[in-house]
Amino acid sequence: MADYRTLFSPSGTGSAVTVLVALSLLLLLSQATSDPCYDPGGRPRFCLPPVTQLVGKAAAPCSQTCALPADSPDPVCNGTLTLDLDGSFLLTSVTLRFCTAGPPALVLSAAWAIGGPWRPLWRRPAWPGVLGGPKKVTFHSPPGPKTRIVASYLRVELGGKAGLVTTGVRGRCQCHGHAARCAARAQPPRCRCRHHTTGPGCESCRPSHRDWPWRPATPQHPHPCLPCQCHPIGATGGMCNQTSGQCSCKLGVTGLTCNHCGPGYQQSRSPRMPCQRIPEATTALATTPVASRSDPQCQGYCNVSVSSVHMNLQKYCQQDYVLHARVAESAQVSASSSLSSLSEAVGPEWWRLAVHVLAVFKQRAWPVRRGSQEAWVPRADLSCGCLRLRPGADYLLLGRAAENHTDPAHLILNRHSLALPWRPRWAGPLRRLQQKERGGACRGLLPPTRSPGPRN
């Protein structure tokens, strides 16, 4: 059977008291550690550091008459006293104490810098017949956010003889409503900034929170600094410009938040380089032979003398046709056909090639249709190695329409044309060039004076 005396013993009572004390301490600790710049829900709010006694220095010290004998020949101070507050503060009150009767006239001014401009805070004019003023003068800053007084220097102008003993200045650090604590005696005073602000007076946003320009907090709106909305892949980091919010973008990336590719670039799958420059259609002539050197008649006959052609918009526009075709078969024909008018210029015989046009990337004036049709090649061009076509192979055919021919419907492949072994990767760039041509990009780009050739 349990002993009830043990349950209600003094030791049990002591444990309950200990628990109550611990709970009280936790409550006080939570209140002490609560942030005045945030409400209980974690939302930012306007906050100010506490009022403190500020320390000033006398730039033009006057005599302490209370420490001098009463019969001193000059026991009073007459002139101007300037106080350096060692920082920018919001003034709440200024107290002047005199050990003799105060001066009949007194002017209190404040300024941001030692040279002014000075703003009068309080003025007491001299009255006729009045020999002096009170021994203690206190100036209080008027309430309201629009009448706050921010000063780094104070100036006291004494309009008569008086013995000034002490000057008491009270105020709070100028934290622009973004801090509730401040090291007022530091030089310069430093606010413990909140709302993602930084600087001695919380006068700017952190580099990572510059989505909107910095603004001072008000009781109606705390104006916290918002994080930069930089794209995690397109931007070089999380920092943005304090004025515009522009993020620092990677090469080829543009936009306020670096979220899309710029002109001339296309999206890639690489997180390190998300936008890559759109490549020009590059075609290789590794399998296109040069002219035969054994036959003297072939020397300098062919136009093809290099191994690569870089197809850009200008060279594309200078072509009469750009085709993707497959060579099917060939048969020899005589020059007595309908193309006999050309036989004198390029040779006595022709080769007729049966080709299958798979795609038309640039259409000539006389349209070339997809499907099976004939292409005509001069025999001399084939024998000199200007064109080497293999049955069953796919080629990219580029060239200009033959001049002085009797049938414009025929597709002519001569020494000025290019027959390049087809590469599937060329289709995308060529389609983009075709879209630009349809949009009018080729207007004004006249064909060259001579037939298109490879890049030197």
Swiss-Prot record:
Keywords of the record: Developmental protein, Disulfide bond, Glycoprotein, Laminin EGF-like domain, Neurogenesis, Repeat, Secreted, Signal
Major location (coarse): secreted
Domain Laminin EGF-like, chain residue ranges per copy: 173-227, 228-277
Compartments where located: Secreted
Domain of life (superkingdom): Eukaryota
Signal sequence coordinates: 1-34
ATP-binding recorded as keyword: no
Entries under SMART domains matching the protein: C345C, EGF_Lam
GO biological process: animal organ morphogenesis; dendrite development; motor neuron axon guidance; neurogenesis; tissue development
Alphabetical list of PROSITE patterns matching this protein: EGF_1, EGF_LAM_1, EGF_LAM_2, NTR
Domain NTR: 298-442
Disulphide linkage map: C173-C182, C175-C191, C193-C202, C205-C225, C228-C240, C230-C247, C249-C258, C261-C275, C298-C384, C302-C386, C317-C442
InterPro entries: Laminin/Netrin_ECM, LE_dom, Netrin_domain, Netrin_module_non-TIMP, TIMP-like_OB-fold
Pfam families: EGF_laminin (PF00053), NTR (PF01759)
Function: Plays a role in neurogenesis. Prevents motor neuron cell body migration out of the neural tube.
Protein's name according to its UniProt entry: Netrin-5
